[in-house]
């Protein structure tokens, strides 16, 4: 395990703990202010199980909803990509010391890949038709190494758990605001309720930062578990962004503009294969681009230039 991998693992772990601690600290502070009355505690005891159940249901059945949205189907032996993809996924799973996930094809043109799963659906990795068209097999292997990192690190479960915190805080504040049981502290309780609802919004930025760390951690996983993974993942990322025809938003001319995540951009862009020829130029620009600390503040993925430069360091280590 590299020093960078250890640092990202510890940083995201500490941030996750901090999110839980701050979240429940806010709830405790509200309860303390209003006197830990039975009604407020009962409200919390009702809300918490409800949202935990909702999270569990989303986790268990989410893969089926994802499959419906992105028109995924399990890779069949009759498909031309079967041997190549099963060989790649099997090898990368073996390198990561985890059981081989099921391989799915998403019948969409946007170049992308994603890892998901649940105890009911099992672990899955899906690649889109668009991705298969623009990447070489060794680049696909690097992308699979990234997605395998998400499965290995249990990122889906972690994000669902952490995402519960702002939701709980919001509805706790919302219910207090309209509960009608404020007594003499009516003004203070209304203010606390509004602060709690505002805090739940600000928590989203912490969760985005947490997710960016996990994405970087998955990049490092690919670099460490796939031969030549760092270089191939760099090329794959440049090709994917170039193929969307939206490269302008990541060039130096606009480096101070907060960017959307690569995944979000892919979900909302139509592929432009003619732009693919520019990926080498784009890659070289990213290697030396000076990116603002806040360039990806509103994104759930690191700015592509940050990812490329981190992978460049791994190549040299």
Curated annotation (Swiss-Prot):
The active site is at residue 147. Zn(2+) binds at residues 146, 150, 215. GO terms for biological process: proteolysis. One of its GO terms (cellular component) is plasma membrane. It is found in: Cell membrane. Its cofactor is Zn(2+). Its EC number is 3.4.24.-. Binds 1 zinc ion per subunit. Keywords: Cell membrane, Hydrolase, Membrane, Metal-binding, Metalloprotease, Protease, Transmembrane, Transmembrane helix, Zinc. This is Protease HtpX homolog. It is a multi-pass membrane protein. It holds the Pfam family Peptidase_M48. The lineage of its organism: Archaea, Methanobacteriati, Thermoplasmatota, Thermoplasmata, Thermoplasmatales. GO terms for molecular function: metalloendopeptidase activity; zinc ion binding.
């Amino acid at each position: 395990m590299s020093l960078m991998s250890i640092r990202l693992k510890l940083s995201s772990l500490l941030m996750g703990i901090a999110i839980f601690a701050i979240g429940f600290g806010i709830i405790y502070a509200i309860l303390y202010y209003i006197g830990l009355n039975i009604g407020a505690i009962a409200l919390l005891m009702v809300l918490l199980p409800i949202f935990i159940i909702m999270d569990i249901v989303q986790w268990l059945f989410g893969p089926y909803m994802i499959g419906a949205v992105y028109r995924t189907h399990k890779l069949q032996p009759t498909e031309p990509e079967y041997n190549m993809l099963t060989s790649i996924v099997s090898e990368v799973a073996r390198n990561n010391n985890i059981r081989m996930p099921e391989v799915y094809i998403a019948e969409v043109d946007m170049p992308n890949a994603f890892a998901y799963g649940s105890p009911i659906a099992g672990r899955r990795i899906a690649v889109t038709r668009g991705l298969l068209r623009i990447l070489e097999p060794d680049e696909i292997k690097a992308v699979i190494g990234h997605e395998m990192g998400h499965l290995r690190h249990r990122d889906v479960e972690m994000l669902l758990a952490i995402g519960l915190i702002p939701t709980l805080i919001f509805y706790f504040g919302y219910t207090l605001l309209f509960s009608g049981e404020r007594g003499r502290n009516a003004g203070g309780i209304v203010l606390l309720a509004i602060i709690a609802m505002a805090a739940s919004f600000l928590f989203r930025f912490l969760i985005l930062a947490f997710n960016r760390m996990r994405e970087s951690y998955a990049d490092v996983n690919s670099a460490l578990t796939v031969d030549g993974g760092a270089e191939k993942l760099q090329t794959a990322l440049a090709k994917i962004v170039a193929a969307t025809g939206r490269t302008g938003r990541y060039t130096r001319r606009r480096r101070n503009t907060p960017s959307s995540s690569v995944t979000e951009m892919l979900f909302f862009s139509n592929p432009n294969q003619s732009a693919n020829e520019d990926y080498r130029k784009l890659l070289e620009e990213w290697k030396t681009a000076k990116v603002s600390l806040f360039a990806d503040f509103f994104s759930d993925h690191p700015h592509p230039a940050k990812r490329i430069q981190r992978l460049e360091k791994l190549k040299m280590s």
